[in-house]
Structures are given as structure tokens and as C-alpha cells.
Amino acid sequence: MHEWALADAIVRTVLDYAQKEGASRVKAVKVVLGELQDVGEDIVKFAMEELFRGTIAEGAEIIFEEEEAVFKCRNCGHVWKLKEVKDKLDERIREDIHFIPEVVHAFLSCPKCGSHDFEVVKGRGVYISGIMIEKEGEE
């Protein structure tokens, strides 16, 4: 389950940051989940809560934001979103993209010109977009 590995990496990053900043407590963490990753938000949240247990981040608010997948055709310049073509993909293909987002080029093509030569503008990956900490003596 790669969600636990993602949660572990997020937790280690949050705790490292908090330590470097001299935090007494982590109040909140905001995590952006790229739509192409199709990450199980509930699993990541549960894993983070478990991994935060016994640390200065225990009880921190965990906020998720999904970043929609956007593509740009290198052939004709057309920009489109995954949600515009997702219904045309069968479940197996969606699962393949979930586990290996790089395969998206094999399964998608520009809805305007049909080219498979496109870039992923956004919506790939997982990253921390904010960490709210508290230092001793602050509220």
C-alpha cells in the first residue's frame, strides 16, 4: 500500500521541519494530492495520525486538497483536464495510471488532435503545501 509510504514520508518531513524551526507543537499540515496519483485520502490520513502519535504533531489538523490533472498538447497547444476524458477510461487503465502516473501518455491523447505528445501541467504527485507550528510561549 503506497499510501502508508507516502504518509511516512510526509510525517518525517513535517517532524524534521518542526524540529529545525524549534516548534513545540505542530498544529496543522496541508497536503496536496495530485489527481493522477489517485491516492486514498482516508488511508493517508489514518496513517499520518498513527505515525504522529506520541510526537509533537499528535492531534495536528490534517487538511487535504486535490490538485486536478491538467494537460497541454505539444502538437496543437490544446489544454484539457483529466475529468474531461476520465469517463472514457476503463477501471483497469485508471488503476494503472494510479500506480504509475507516467503511463498516462500510453492511454490518453489530446481530445482535439489525437496526439500522445502532451505534458502534465499539474496534478501529478503529492506535496506538503503548508505546515502550521507553534513555538514555546506562542499560541
UniProtKB/Swiss-Prot annotation:
Binding site for Ni(2+): 2
One function term, GO molecular function aspect: zinc ion binding
InterPro entries: Hydgase_Ni_incorp_HypA/HybF_CS, HypA/HybF
Transmembrane segments: none
Annotated coiled-coil segments of the chain: none
Superkingdom assignment: Archaea
Alphabetically ordered keywords of this record: Metal-binding, Nickel, Zinc
Keyword Transferase belongs to the record: no
NCBIfam families reported for this sequence: PRK03824.1 (NF003008)
Family membership noted in the UniProt record: Belongs to the HypA/HybF family.
Summary of the function given for this chain in its UniProt record: Involved in the maturation of [NiFe] hydrogenases. Required for nickel insertion into the metal center of the hydrogenase.
UniProt protein name: Hydrogenase maturation factor HypA
Gene name of the encoded protein: hypA
